[in-house]
Amino acid sequence: MLAAVMDYFRSCWGPRSPAGHRVRGSDVAGRQDGLLWYKDAGQLVTGEFSMAVVQANNLLEDQSQVESGALSMAEPGPQGTFIGVYDGHGGPETARFINDHMFHHLRRFATEHKCMSTDVIRKAFQATEEGFLSLVSKQWSLKPQIAAVGSCCLVGVICSGTLYVANLGDSRAVLGRFVKSTGEVVATQLSSEHNACYEEVRQELQASHPDDPQIVVLKHNVWRVKGLIQISRSIGDVYLKRPEYNREPLHSKFRLRETFKRPILSSEPAIAVHQIQPNDHFVIFASDGLWEHLSNQEAVDLVQNNPRNGIARRLVKVAMQEAAKKREMRYSDLKKIDRGVRRHFHDDITVIVVFLDSNAISKANWSRGPSVSLRGGGVTLPANSLAPFSTPTVLSSTY
């Protein structure tokens, strides 16, 4: 029985090679310490990386992946690195779905186009959204709550000396760039955010829905789309995109009183294209759980002023220390709080730091390098779980 359980955990979180084979070994797959999962250091075809995930929700709603090597199915084809951070809400289903499908779609479209481009990335987002909509359609009658599950989606692709950053929601990618004149490493945000707390997002929503004075509502001092959700773009959240799912048997707290004729939320990603320069040192990809507690420059300073090995774990720790400070409690006490209850203090946090090696990036264009396929981990519960069901306990851990 124990062997079967361990096989299940390995199947959920073990890394795969591009051919689909699992790579065994705790160092390769990352390590678990209480609610913290981490991979302190690893080598990509474009440089080094560090990765960490800490769980706060009863069900881990953050999903993440690092893929490095072939970016298409063609031989020869473009080589590079793919980063994905998927911050789910309402449950883990959408984020898990993106983790299973986004990179596959990207490789498929890169094969068709014979290159990497914004069109390839946009089509991968669209195919992932359509795939999840199809899943909702199949499961709606038995599991209507799945229509109210969604995810932010942050993707980074490094290929042929270019960094593409595509985003839906409020995860963030921040570049650390060395400024020769001052000797400082300065933070530059590469991603656009889609959260109603920003005036420009509210204006965009109002322009798209001029006949709806309640398209954004200030509720308990927080701006929300239709009074329900803070983000304006996502994968999933079908109940705010297709009116046929905004009805019974969906729970009444998600249903709008009035019907709608066009989607309220969008799945169109904002895509930035950045030509990598020698003074571009690293990029921090993280869910909003990190950015709630650290500014862009604070995060960049931490990466710049500390060893690469374990830097993602260090960022998570500093964010948790800030969360504890805000609640006037000790970090050591916060670590003892189990998933579920922990969400009252901080969100799930995912951090992936990618160091940009100009030499490796130039060599990786079409030549084979080390292949990496890794997914962020956590305390896993059954894949079909929609609702928390365990009693929180006190944990002991060393991070």
UniProtKB/Swiss-Prot annotation:
One GO biological process from the UniProt record? regulation of intracellular signal transduction
Cofactor stoichiometry and binding?
Binds 2 magnesium or manganese ions per subunit.
Q: Which cofactor does it need?
A: Mg(2+); Mn(2+)
Top-level enzyme category: hydrolase
Which Gene3D superfamilies would you find in this protein's record? PPM-type phosphatase domain
User: Taxonomically, which superkingdom?
Assistant: Eukaryota
Name all PPM-type phosphatase domain ranges: 48-356
Instruction: Extract the InterPro entries matched here.
Output: PP2C, PP2C_BS, PPM-type-like_dom_sf, PPM-type_phosphatase-like_dom
Task: Please write the reaction equations for the catalytic activity of this protein.
Answer: O-phospho-L-seryl-[protein] + H2O = L-seryl-[protein] + phosphate; O-phospho-L-threonyl-[protein] + H2O = L-threonyl-[protein] + phosphate
- Leader peptide range in chain numbering: none
Q: Which residues bind Mn(2+) 2?
A: D87, D288, D347
The reply on keyword Manganese is yes
* GO MF term set: metal ion binding; protein serine/threonine phosphatase activity
Tell me which EC number(s) this protein carries. Answer: 3.1.3.16
Q: Which SMART domains match?
A: PP2Cc (SM00332)
UniProt keywords (A-Z) are:
Hydrolase, Magnesium, Manganese, Metal-binding, Protein phosphatase
Protein residues bound to Mn(2+) 1: D87, G88
PANTHER family, sorted:
PROTEIN PHOSPHATASE
Q: Which family does it belong to?
A: Belongs to the PP2C family.
Q: What is this protein called?
A: Probable protein phosphatase 2C 28
